[in-house]
Amino acid sequence: MKFVVIDDDPTGSQTVHDCLLLLKWDCSTLLKGFESNSNLFFILANTRSLSENDAKLTITEICKNLKTVISSKAFEEEIIFISRGDSTLRGHNFLEPSALNSCLGPFDATFYIPAFIEGKRLTINGSHFVDKIPINQTIFASDKIFGYETSNVKKLLFQQSKSQINFEDIQNLFLSDIEMLNDEENNIVYKALKNLNNNKHVIVDVENYSQLKKFSLVIKKLIKQKKFLFRTAASFISSISEKKSVSQSEIFFSNLRIRNKEKSFLPGLIIVGSYVELSTIQLNNLLEISNCNP
């Protein structure tokens, strides 16, 4: 099973390790991803920084090259496509999966899983929260490009689709459903997932990794007979691929610094660009604990 993650900005790989992050998507580069030893690779599309039209063109180009590579090689393993998006609901959340479905589909369903457990960004009863605060009450909702007024993911997805999908056709997989879920054929939730078709849109509640693991195990069983697409934040990727991030020491990261011929560390440059308050706090902490000069 190979997981292909099309990432809308550079942070999607933060919960995994030991996989390729492709900065280009020509056919020869994509082939390296498919032939890599890892069951997972990322394509950095960076579409969150693009207009709707340019984002769609980029995703379409990536998809066409993916189809070319896949058709030219007889890959025996299942391929699962993941559109990695923001855990604070910014970005082209409907447009990008829609473009993927048009080019690589048709899919039986698209699952929306914006939970980022490490950042306390959770989906409960269909609404999204940051550290228990409804997402529409946070600074992220005031984004000048991707702002929104609701924490209800179903309502937001419908609004972002510009009525291309019916509100009633968007389904929820609630925590109570996941509690009941198992991979037995007679399980009522399992059967509901198995019967999804015509690219149903399903919003998945998540508040911890055990729920993600249970969902991921069922998906891996169903994927042999169903064709599913995913629009998710980073936590689902580590769950489904079983490649959780590895904690590293300060010595490990310091060894990544570039050295000169005498093996002394060369100076580096840190560029920070964000209006989010958390980034300001992180920058101030960096200036306090290091010899960085602004």
Regions from the language model: what does each represent?
Residues 1-3, 7, 14-17, 29-32, ...:
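Cap/lid and interdomain-hinge subdomains that line or gate substrate/regulatory clefts
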Residues 3, 38-42, 110, 200-202, ...:
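Hydrophobic beta-strand segments of well-ordered beta-sheets in folded domains
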Residues 7, 44-45, 114, 206, ...:
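Pocket-edge structural micro-motifs
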Residues 10, 47, 86, 117, ...:
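Short, glycine/serine-rich, charged loops/turns that create anion-binding
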Residues 20, 45-46:
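N-terminal domain-start signal
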Residues 22-25, 294:
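Short beta-strand/loop segment at the start of cytosolic alpha/beta domains
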Residues 46-52, 209-211, 236, 277:
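Short acidic, S/G/P-rich loop/turn micro-motifs used as interaction or catalytic elements
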Residues 219-294:
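Acidic, glycine-rich loop-and-beta core segments that form the ion-binding/anion-interacting portion
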